[in-house]
Amino acid sequence: MTTLMVQGTTSDAGKSTLVTALCRWATRQGVAVVPFKPQNMALNSAVTADGGEIGRAQAVQAQAAFLEPHTDMNPVLLKPNSDTGAQVIIHGRAVTSMNAVAYHDYKAIAMQAVLASHERLSAAYPLVMVEGAGSPAEINLRAGDIANMGFAEAVDCPVLLIADINRGGVFAHLVGTLELLSPSEQARIKGFIINRFRGDIALLQPGLDWLEQRTGKPVVGVLPYVMDLHLEAEDGIDQRQTDKAEQVLKVVVPVLPRISNHTDFDPLRLHPQVDLQFIGPGQAIPPADLIILPGSKSVRSDLAYLRANGWESAIRRHLRYGGKLLGICGGLQMLGEQVHDPLGLEGAPGSSAGLGLLAFETQLEAEKQLRNVRGRLALEDAEVSGYEIHAGVTTGAALEKAAVHLDDGRCDGAQSLDGQIFGTYLHGLFESPAASAALLRWAGLYDVQEVDYHGLRERDIERLADLVEKHLDTGLLRELCGISPCSS
């Protein structure tokens, strides 16, 4: 069994993407590889085959390894529900919410879960490909660390350090990070990878030579900047757009402070006939064909934020003029009359008035609903697959006109009688080509082009593996991964 870890000098250095690439590259060598991230902090999560939730980046990495996502791939998931606190998910199940100070004291327990998952994966797969979190050189977080060097030291694994040259200061990032590590941690760094390089590599070569002489460690390779890579973002909302056709549907998404699973919108961002616009604080909602209320980790506070920005009146005006409104998960709950949180799961206990657009109420309960589902939209009877991640139980007369009929016999969501409003608990709606096309037609787009989002993601994973083979020292990678030359 071999474990190789990728750590980064900063957040968004390219760790998730590199681990995805290495997982697919390893499978090309005939090696059964499994992705692993000890601790992840993200509001984008995926439902696993064993009925839990993990970070979506690990689900993409599982696809790269031709595996079904499993909770052992991300044993500790932190989902922020305030500026200072987060829901703590261990082995796919929410166990508690706590602030940062309390979680610091909880890390020893979390580390037990991390090591147990790693032990199980190590027993089942010859290669475990690990992604760190943030930077290993965060001085204030090093005590009790379970996400970076604390984990690497515990399991005695080598580390590759990646840095993003596109943001500038790449040599300072690499050397500075190395200098802030202990001698034993420095020894674990087996090489550097520079990410997102544009230009002539010959102009960079003197810097690479200096880096190797200064540190005594090799540069494993320089990965180019890839303009049209469309894997799901782990944290920030990706607002890049593809080139659009002449016939375009205008879709607007208000960005809420606790927005969750914003990867729901990636297929729309890539659709050639959709103009997707995210609206931030202080911005007015522009004229649109479709407004989508996204998922939320804190529905009541996000409702207050929506109102404070004047978006409620904009939504009502949008409906008056015939526009369509879609609510997903927390967005569905906002469409109703009341949201009750008697246990204080998402803040102070209490109730908040919803938008009152559909006749139902939602009560938040401690047990979260986690499942992958299949079914058919009420719109056009279109086939859909997706996943549920929610703590709310919704009841009321509006549910009699369901939005989705699930294969397990349940009905999901609701529609307005006039057909302008559609709400569902299902994430991933737009990843199903037929369901996406039906929703876009409902919103006013005709002659819809169906887009194979899963196919696009698979293509990009293959491209990443190609970049590894072309730009990295695969001989050193084989050595670090314990892959013999005859494995492929």
Swiss-Prot record:
Pfam families: CbiA, GATase_3. Pathway: Cofactor biosynthesis; adenosylcobalamin biosynthesis. InterPro entries: Class_I_gatase-like, CobQ/CobB/MinD/ParA_Nub-bd_dom, CobQ_GATase1, CobQ_N, CobQ_synth, GATase_3, P-loop_NTPase. Residues 248-435 form the GATase cobBQ-type domain. It comes from the Bacteria. GO terms for molecular function: ABC-type vitamin B12 transporter activity; catalytic activity. Belongs to the CobB/CobQ family. CobQ subfamily. This is Cobyric acid synthase. It comes from Pseudomonas fluorescens (strain Pf0-1).
